[in-house]
Each structure stands twice: as C-alpha cells, then as structure tokens.
Amino acid sequence: KKKTVVNDSNTPLHLLQPAYQGTYGDLTPEQVNKEVDRVFAYIDKETPARVVDKNTGKQITDYTIMGEEAQLERGAFRLASYEWGVTYSALIAATEATGDQRYTDYVQSRFRFLAEVAPHFKRVYEEKGTTDPQLLQILTPHALDDAGAVCAAMVKVRVKDRSLPVDGLIENYFDFIQNKEYRLADGTFARNRPQHNTLWLDDMFMGIPAVAQMSRYDKAQKEIYLAEAIRQFLQFADRMFIPEKGLYRHGWVESSTDHPAFCWARANGWAMLTACE
C-alpha cells in the first residue's frame, strides 16, 4: 500500500510531530543563507501557482470559461492559509536581511496569481454556489485565521510595489477583520469557542499586525489604525500576560472565575511576532 504523504494540505500542521535534523548553536551568515535557500527551494517547488481541473489534473489557462471543476493545484502547502501568511512575511524579512530579492519575488508572484484568479473563482461561486475551498477562504473569510496573516503580508509588499494588483483582496480581508470579526464588549478580538467570549492568544497575530500595517496602506487613517492596534495589544496583554512567568496564557474565558495559565510555546511565538510588528 502506498504510504500517504502527510503535509499541510491534508493534516493540520500543529498535529505533526517534529523531525529536527539540524543542530542548535551559533551559526555563521553563510550557514544561515544555506539553510534559508534549502527551505526556500523546497517551498517554492511545493506551492505551485496554477489552476487545474480537479477531475483530470490538467492545467486550466483560460479562467473565463472555468467552472466548478477548477481548483488551485495542490502542493504541500496552501497559498492562503495563515501558516503561509506568516511564511510570506518571513520571506519579506529574509529579503530585507540578506538583500536577496528572490524571496520577495516569490511572495509577489503568488499574490499576483491569487489576485488574477480570485475574480474568476468568485464568478464560479456566485453561479454554482460552490468553488475551491482554498479560494473561499480568500473570498468569504469566516475567522481571523482566514484573513489576518495573509492580509498583513499583502500590505507589506503592496506599499513597496504600487503595481501589485491586490487592493481588492486586501480590502476584502480587512473588511472582515475590522467589521465582521467577533469581539468582546470592549472591542477585543474574540471567539465563541470553546466557550462564549474566549480570547485565543493566536488572534493577537491573526488580527493585530494587519491593523498595524493598514496604517501604512491608508495613511489618511494612519493614527486610527495605530491606535486600534495598540488598544488590541494592550487589551490582550492585560488578560493574557503572566508577569511572574514572562509568558502569555493561551486562552482566557470571560465568564471563568479563575484563569488557568497554559503557556503553549507556539502561541507565545504568535504573541512575540505581534509585539515585533
């Protein structure tokens, strides 16, 4: 029996077991560049920017006549997931750190592709009532996970390259973040799972950086967006940060009489990235 390849397209990344082969310690810039290039070559290969017929696997190049059979070609990773949103931001940062434009070129090429095909998948969805779930995540986001990380990365490259045709995608994402995401009474981003009015530390990164980056995109409202980003950060930190540990709890339930502190490493990583943003 053929062994199933486990990847982000068929298994949630947070359920995968690590298989570290590298060693920890001081690294030279040359070693870092070598590792970054190794990872970059892999993710570039595993994230094709093509539309295919899901029944035949054949590439579709004329988007104007495609129907519900159309989907993004499946690689190991999804082009519009929150995991890939933070990967896009990492690649932008890699260009800034190394001067190697290939990393940002990758981000721009994937965003140009998504901007080109999104209207056609939207047409299919409106006509047929269904389309590729990976595009529905872009067209009709239902959670910060669907919108925030990719939106923040899009803004970062859009403010540097005005020719990048992602305004419609950015505005659709941000409309959800600003106007449709569930919030506590004081405006803090929240969820209704696993309990009513629950804060997830993850949502610091899934929401706040996009708001902060919008201050660069819409300079007329710069101060409003910066104030909102700071307000969100402080309201999360007030409930989630544990001073004696120097860490954040992963969850906070408004109706709870006590607030246990489970400090998940991955979620604390989201909080630290948010602080950097």
Residue positions per predicted region:
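Well-ordered alpha-helical segments within folded domains of soluble proteins
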Residues: 9-20, 79-96, 133-158, 199-216, ...
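Residue-level preference for long, well-ordered alpha-helices that form the structural scaffold
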Residues: 28, 32, 83, 103, ...
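Alpha-solenoid helical repeat scaffolds
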Residues: 97, 117, 160, 217-220
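Mid-sequence acidic-hydrophobic segments that form the walls
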Residues: 157-160, 173-184, 213-217, 236-239
